[in-house]
């Protein structure tokens, strides 16, 4: 699958814009293009990873893979209820608590708090638990493991992958952290820095 991205904005000519162009030999900043060849066609996969530095095009590429909006881990939470009541409210209780534990949110008192009062890391993991329980057919998650410390990120990536592989659906994770690759064991990886892709053997 080839994903093409082209962003365009006005070519500004303010004093500062002109000075930046002159000082740094930058003709303009109004065009940004990227073409990425993702190894997804003909591959039976569940987890894909797009990795690269900030500004390398991960979000732009990810938002075009399925033609659907990026899954928002932080939207749609009821601030008047604990997160354990917000995740799959009509679903199985054990599936919800199992998902919370599986994504690394094992601090049970946090389950009894509403989403807005959680830490950034807890919010991220609660969002992953909701994703696991909702189990959409296809989803793209941006900033995967960006707001949690690196050791928890590695273990959490492995735990998420193990949980996700138990069910159906395809998920593409976007991350600036290369250290999660061996823990996540994705079916394919696209590196925005090297413009390369690899599928798992």
Annotate the PLM regions.
Residues 1-42, 78-79:
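Pre-NBD coupling/linker segments of ABC/ABC-like ATPases
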Residues 6, 34, 40-105, 176, ...:
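ABC ATPase nucleotide-binding domain signature region
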Residues 13-15, 23-29, 65-126, 130-136, ...:
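ABC-family P-loop ATPase nucleotide-binding domains
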Residues 47-49, 138, 170-172:
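Residue-level preference for the first positions of well-ordered beta-strands
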Residues 140-149:
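Walker B catalytic motif
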Residues 160-173, 177, 181:
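Conserved catalytic loops of ABC-family nucleotide-binding domains
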Residues 183-191:
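Conserved catalytic segment of ABC-fold P-loop ATPases
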Residues 195-201:
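Conserved small/polar residues in nucleotide/adenosyl-binding loops
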């Amino acid at each position: 699958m080839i994903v093409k991205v082209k962003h365009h904005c006005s070519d500004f000519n303010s004093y500062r814009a002109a000075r930046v162009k002159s000082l740094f030999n930058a003709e303009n900043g109004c065009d940004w293009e990227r073409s990425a060849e993702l190894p997804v066609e003909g591959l039976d996969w569940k987890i894909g990873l797009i990795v690269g530095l900030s500004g390398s095009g991960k979000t732009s590429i990810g938002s075009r893979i399925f033609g659907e909006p990026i899954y928002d881990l932080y939207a749609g939470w009821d601030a008047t209820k604990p997160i354990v009541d917000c995740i799959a409210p009509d679903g199985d209780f054990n599936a919800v608590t199992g998902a919370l534990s599986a994504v690394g949110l094992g601090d049970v008192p946090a389950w009894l708090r509403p989403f807005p009062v959680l830490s950034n890391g807890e919010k991220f993991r609660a969002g992953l638990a909701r994703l696991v329980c909702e189990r959409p057919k296809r989803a793209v998650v941006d900033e995967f493991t960006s707001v949690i410390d690196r050791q928890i990120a590695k273990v959490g990536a492995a735990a998420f992958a193990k949980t996700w592989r138990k069910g159906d659906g395809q998920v593409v994770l976007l991350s600036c952290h290369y250290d999660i690759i061996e823990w996540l064991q994705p079916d394919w990886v696209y590196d925005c820095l090297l413009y390369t892709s690899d599928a798992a053997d």
